[in-house]
Amino acid sequence: MNKKFKQISIALSAVGMLSLVACQSMEQGTGQKASANLDSRSGSQAKGEVMFTWQGDDVLINGKFSGLKPNSEQGFHVHEKGDCSAPDATSAGGHFNPETKSHGMPNSGMNHAGDLPNIKSDANGNATYTAKLHGFAVNTGPTGIVGRSVVVHRDPDDYKSQPAGNSGPRIACGLIK
């Protein structure tokens, strides 16, 4: 009887642990949001607003930008530090890269978590941006982007040059809250 009680106790403990893990997973990615207001840096006129919404394993990113070079592409990244105080936004640090991967194409699995698709501006230097990515979370955890910064670069990211895609100066920066 004692052996059977022990087996039942172990089984119930395992079920309880699995339930806790399942509940934690369900809490994550169920609509948590963060946003950033980007201000001009490096003498540019660029600015924007970005919203991050966690949906399951993915994060939906929506943004609006102005003051960009007309009919062009700009690199766009989440950076490791939540600090945009430097005039050239170098205070934001490098690309957010919690898994120490090489720089690369977004969603390839072989990229920094902070590597985002380029922004494409219209003839007036405005852009509307939408992307759905994975590899990071909308929280303050080790893979979380809350408390970090998001940066627009002057030039397009080539997704191959190391360590940062050869995307030029940082022209706008905002803290992700």
Regions found by a protein language model. Give the residues of each.
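Bacterial N-terminal signal peptides that target proteins for export
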Residues: 2-12
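N-terminal leader/targeting pre-sequences
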Residues: 2, 16-73, 78-177
